[in-house]
Amino acid sequence: MDFLDTIVRRNPSLIQTAVSMHQRNELPANSVVVDLDMVEENAVKILDAAAGRGIHLYFMTKQFGRNPEICRTLNNVGIDKAVAVDLEDGICLQKNGIRVGHIGHLVQIPKASIRYVLSSMAPEVITVFSYEKALQISEVAKDLGIVQNLLIRVVGKGDFFYPFQFGGIEEEDLLETVGKICKLPSVRVVGVVSFPCFRFDVKARKTMPMPNLFTLKRTVKTLEKELGLRITQINAPGDSSAQMMDQFRELGVTHVEPGNAFTGTTPWHAFEDLPEKPAWLYLSEISHIDGDNAYAIGGGLMSGDSPMGIWSTLYHNHRLNALSGDNVDSILRRKILAERSGYIDYYGTLYGNREVEFSVGDSVIYGLRNQVFVSRANVAIVKGIQSHKPVLLGIFDRLGNPIETSFFGR
């Protein structure tokens, strides 16, 4: 499943602007093009829905390449802290003056970097998967003369985790392990976390709570009753769009971590028009033609969420499409069948049809759910699309660093 039809229907100006700017050599191929005004509109909807229900937000940045323009926009809306999914995330955010609220989940902080994280980032909370990691943090925090708040990653029987994301403190070992952590100096257990706590159900066509969430709720009761802890954070990320805030409140969630919701590309957005509108696309161009097929320059195709978990069903049941052409007036009608690319995505295959004739240099538009942090894609930030006065604010790499635009003919 891709988001192309949704973009055509709900934000056609984004497509037309991307094609126009690409054909004028203002946007390079292999770029995730971001409609910054739409991101801002989406963020306002998410924050308003969350604040009205007592839900706190940490914004996730990996999917849009830790982009500083987007981060500052989210800050200006009123979402003041980010979540760093790994150390690299945290470094990028801290370098750009973005406050890190949460780090250590999904990826634990390497021991050699704990001092840097505590002294330079000063995160609100750090997630630990084990007593040993809590001990490492305790030793550094004590040396720095601070008290660091911790979240406990808990694993219950029957919980669901995506491949290569396993680990945490087993529920049956909870009291023993957390009891030991509570005796450490300079750390304080304030909450629990898991992922995914919510996941899109293809049959129900809506996002539903996962067993992980109920493990967290049991854990909170146990820690408060047996250890006398005051748990202030039940961090339950997973498809955190504005539509979900009522459910979060009803289920006792205190913190969530929206990411793809800001660009209108959670799984639910592929099936239903939620409050957030699509705010990005993937732009390429035809490199060459071979028989009836054309080949689009790659670099970001593989980052369109690899087929695992929820996406395996969608990938098997739906084909990928694209738009191709050089004319703004006709581009929305020039739909073609495309092929997904492998990990080394030099090119993406485009299949010809009777209605669309390929030309080298034509723009190619995909509607992907990108994960820029694991790609070679550029990130192009454009403001003014909705007012039909587009301005390119900059082109960035996956780390949020500006790229010299002379490389692209500007």
PLM regions with names:
Residues 56-201:
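Active-site-proximal beta-alpha core segment in soluble small-molecule metabolic enzymes
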Residues 156-274:
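Active-site loop/helix belt of alpha/beta enzymes
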Residues 294-296, 300-410:
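C-terminal accessory subdomain/extension
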Residues 46, 137, 216:
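Aromatic/hydrophobic pocket-lining residues that form π-stacking "cages" and hydrophobic walls in ligand
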